[in-house]
A protein has these predicted regions:
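Short loop/edge segments at beta-strand edges and connector loops
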Residues: 34, 86-89, 246
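Alpha-helical elements of Rossmann-like donor-binding domains used by nucleotide-donor carbohydrate transfer enzymes
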Residues: 17, 38, 72, 89-92, ...
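Active-site substrate-recognition segment that forms the wall
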Residues: 118-125, 129-255
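A structural signal for short hydrophobic beta-strand segments in well-ordered beta-sheet cores
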Residues: 4, 92-94, 176-177
Length: 255
């Protein structure tokens, strides 16, 4: 569900255009919520303190537990015994000496930071926010860190909120995800944080380039935590001052 706040005409206009765009694709699955009362009809669990002016909900979309999905897929692979998992950090790609008809050198494998070499007939990179280190994506994509925080909730709060839609305020990119295991997750996808690093240009004979790369284990800066508190005061006021049990910066590569 995408919502806009009172008095924010820019956010309202964006959400309205988004509604009409999605409506063309999803038809009756998309429902306009032109007033705060309409929003409350969809998420009464948020309470009367919910400070929104309107929005829309797409009943054809939803939230998926990515971690649970990966665990399930890994379990199936382990049961079949057809896939070998090797863990390590990739330092660079291995490139064929000769070029193809398209003047591009074929990737034949990877070199890990410990010097181990892995080769394959077909190399598929699913490297997410680390891709910019291995492939020159300058002017095409950039890795940014986005804020994520968790707070502990009671059993009663878990039952009350566990089936709510994901609520997104597109004016600031902050969204609240249905809680699982007594943890409420709030996150933001906006311009994000950058972590500039100098790395060798792939195939560049030692010449370096500056790209933004992930930094593991970094908590959300104070700016991000304060933004979450402000958003919670509008969406879930009773949670606004509750302690975050953990925060982290989650990295993405976007065009």
């Amino acid at each position: 569900m995408l919502v806009w706040m009172p008095g924010n005409e820019k956010a309202k206009n964006y959400a309205t255009k988004s509604y009409h765009n999605v409506k063309q694709l999803e038809g009756d699955k998309v429902e306009l919520l032109p007033s705060a009362a309409d929003v409350m009809r969809i998420v009464p669990e948020y309470g009367k303190e919910l400070n929104v002016a309107g929005g829309y909900i797409n009943w054809g979309s939803g939230w998926a537990d990515a971690a649970a999905g990966v665990r399930f897929a890994k379990k199936l692979l382990d049961e079949q015994g057809k896939v070998v998992f090797k863990t390590g950090e990739v330092d660079r790609l291995l490139l064929a000496d000769s070029q193809s008809a398209t003047s591009q050198r074929r990737v034949t494998g990877v070199v890990l930071t410990d010097g181990t070499t892995l080769t394959a007939d077909l190399v598929v990179l699913a490297t997410g926010a680390w891709t910019g280190k291995l492939v020159d994506l300058r002017s095409r994509a950039i890795s940014t860190g986005q804020a994520v925080a968790y707070m502990r909730i009671s059993d009663e709060e878990q039952r009350r909120l566990e089936n709510i839609p994901t609520v997104l305020n597109f004016a600031n990119g902050i969204f609240i995800i249905p809680p699982r295991n007594n943890l409420l997750k709030i996150a933001r996808h906006a311009y994000g944080y950058q972590n500039p690093k100098a790395v060798p240009i792939p195939g560049g004979n030692g010449v370096t380039m500056q790209v933004s790369l992930p930094e593991n284990g970094v908590p959300v800066p104070l700016e991000g935590q304060e933004a979450f508190r402000t958003a919670l005061k509008e969406l879930l006021p009773s949670f606004a001052e509750r302690e975050f049990v953990t925060t982290r910066v989650c990295w993405y590569t976007d065009t």
